[in-house]
């Protein structure tokens, strides 16, 4: 089975997302932007704030990672994350661990059945350190979850294309939407809890992490040396 998530955006934010796409496209050529930017359509009145943003690998700014780290550093109750990949650099791993160590409920849901065995192996190499700091990890047993969702304290959330791996955080063009106080945040948290019902909770033991897959364990150790390229 395959699980994903989607966010419907209306109003001025749509124009911002279009501009982000055109900015990426302009790396290859310089189109006439205005012909693609449709006149703004007034959106229905809604609560909260929505900020679309993008991350470009050519400018040296790690916007996607900084947003995630900021949410982790400011959270007081919980940070719930669904991500298909987990290949962390030192900064993001430290932020996840520190948030858990100061009492925040940091809980990650990852796929129970991978689409890429090497990414799956590398993800598991992070489990022991994260679990040791109190981070909770669950694997969605029905199949592969492709959603990229972060919910913090039921007040803020991010949904978009940005995985917790080097490709998304350093090498790819990505985009996402940061939200605060919007109605859909409660729906996102409800979906997280519903997804959790069909997950296997990973414990801090070698057997629970690797499930007896010795070749996968060995592959994870070896691939660690080239993790930034995977």
Q: Where are each of the predicted segments found?
A:
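Charged, low-complexity intrinsically disordered terminal segments
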Residues: 1-230
């Amino acid at each position: 089975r395959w699980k994903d998530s989607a966010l419907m955006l209306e109003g001025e934010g749509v124009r911002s997302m279009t501009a982000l796409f055109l900015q990426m496209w302009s790396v290859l050529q310089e189109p006439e932007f205005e012909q693609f930017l449709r006149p703004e359509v007034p959106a229905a009145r809604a609560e909260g704030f929505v900020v679309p943003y993008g991350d470009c690998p050519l400018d040296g700014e790690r916007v996607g990672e900084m947003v995630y780290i900021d949410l982790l550093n400011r959270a007081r109750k919980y940070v719930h994350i669904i991500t298909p990949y987990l290949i962390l650099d030192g900064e993001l791993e430290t932020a996840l661990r520190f948030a858990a160590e100061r009492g925040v409920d940091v809980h990650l849901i990852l796929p129970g059945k991978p689409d890429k065995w090497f990414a799956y192996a590398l993800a598991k190499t992070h489990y022991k350190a994260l679990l040791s700091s109190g981070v909770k990890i669950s694997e969605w047993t029905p199949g592969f979850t492709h959603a990229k969702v972060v919910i913090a304290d039921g007040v803020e959330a991010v949904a978009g294309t940005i995985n917790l791996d080097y490709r998304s955080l350093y090498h790819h063009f990505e985009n996402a939407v940061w939200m605060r106080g919007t109605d859909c945040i409660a729906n996102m948290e409800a979906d997280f809890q519903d997804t959790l019902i069909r997950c296997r909770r990973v414990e801090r033991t070698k057997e629970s992490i690797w499930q007896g897959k010795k070749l996968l364990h060995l592959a994870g150790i070896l691939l660690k040396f080239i993790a930034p390229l995977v």
